[in-house]
Amino acid sequence: MYFKKKHFQMEKKGQQHSTHDSFLTHHPVLCIIALSVVFIAIDPFHMSPIGGREFKPMKHEVAPYKQVMENWPRDNLSQLGQHGKLEFVDRVFGPESLEFDGLGRGPYTGLADGRVVRWMGEAVGWETFSVVTSKWSEEACARGVDSTTNKQWKHEKLCGRPLGLRFDKETGNLYIADAYYGLLVVGPEGGVATPLATHVEGKPILFANDLDIHRNGSIFFTDTSKRYDRANHFFILLEGESTGRLLRYDPPTKTTHIVQEGLAFPNGIQLSKDQSFLLFTETTNCRLVKYWLEGAKTGEVEVVADLPGFPDNVRMNKKGEFWVAIDCCRTPAQEVLTDNPWIKSIYFRLPIPMKLLAKAMGMKMYTVISRFDEDGEVLEVLEDRQGKVMKLVSEVREVQGKLWIGTVAHNHIASVPYPLTMN
């Protein structure tokens, strides 16, 4: 009996092994898929774009792709690509924002190496006007054309990254929104800038981005995220998180206040000509938003334009119209990921470079600059579909018979004679 029982148990074990072997033999594809899913979920070598980070994508408010693209006027002549030209190639590095002083000098611009520089004409060239910290040094911070690559990102917290610039035309002071050092100011002679706002409600301002100055002296500025700094801005877009804020600094009391919160990558900001409202861009949600400062709608927020791509800064011309810099364009595949966070979570965990994942979604970034009236009606659209002049755009300034175009990613400025003369 013992022998039979033992023999039966051995036979049973043999059948179990046979069953397992049979599954592996007859279902290799399923096994590979299962192992691949486990590998992707664990991402042991941090090969995916999120690189082993905690990643919590969420749905966010973005207008339907088809609705936006059907109503958006296109520049089929790609006039920006035709008429634009590159300026100061490899002499400026990531010139995000462009500003001109009360004497008409400029442009002034903030660079990826942490400096604010100004153009002094061909005889002098570019000179350093300001830095945002006394810790800045040429040895630690100056990397030339490499400043706009991720080689510089690990140095940004030390060197600073000046983004939005605005002159107070009455005092000649230049106000700076720096991604790491918050809101700062420097006098007409330049030098090391003085911090004004680094915290709000006792917590650090993690990603100051752009600003504008109200006639009463208040400074409105954007704080893009409470979770991610500029070096990690990529994750703000991927997750669709909305912890950004619109802030106001009050010079008499030296205090900073939260005006609006729960924003998805608040970016550029511009007061209206009569200063009854301000416009700001939400990059993640691809839209231009109005915040009322005066009148019956004071304190209310409304979307004035849904955009075909990802907006950066917004600037006003002398007529009170608004130029918006847009990195174009959205794709239907992006909408699928936005509406289905679980798919997005899997997609960006794939051990594939981000460049290839973006290409698979049909993304081909190029520049669109658009002029709006105060109600959000599109007045003009200029495109550079082949990226001849600019692939990633940050700001448009209409000054001295030109459109001056900045970029956070390239080592040049672009310009276009304006108004355009049609041949």
Regions found by a protein language model. Give the residues of each.
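Short loop/turn segments that connect beta-strands within beta-propeller blades
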Residues: 120-124, 187-191, 249-254, 292-297, ...
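Short, conserved, GDST-rich strand-edge loop motifs in beta-rich repeat architectures
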Residues: 52-57, 221-241, 327-364, 415
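Beta-propeller domains
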Residues: 11, 65-73, 77, 102-145, ...
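Beta-strand-rich domains and repeat architectures in extracellular enzymes and scaffolds
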Residues: 23-33, 42-73, 78-116, 387-394
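Residue-level detector of Asp-centered blade-edge/turn motifs that repeat once per structural unit
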Residues: 101-104, 167-171, 213-216, 273-275, ...
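Surface loop/turn motifs at the tips and blade-to-blade linkers of beta-strand repeat domains
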Residues: 86-91, 130-133, 153-158, 196-203, ...
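Asp-box/WD-like beta-propeller blade repeats and closely related beta-sheet repeat scaffolds
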Residues: 143-163, 168-173, 177-237, 241-244
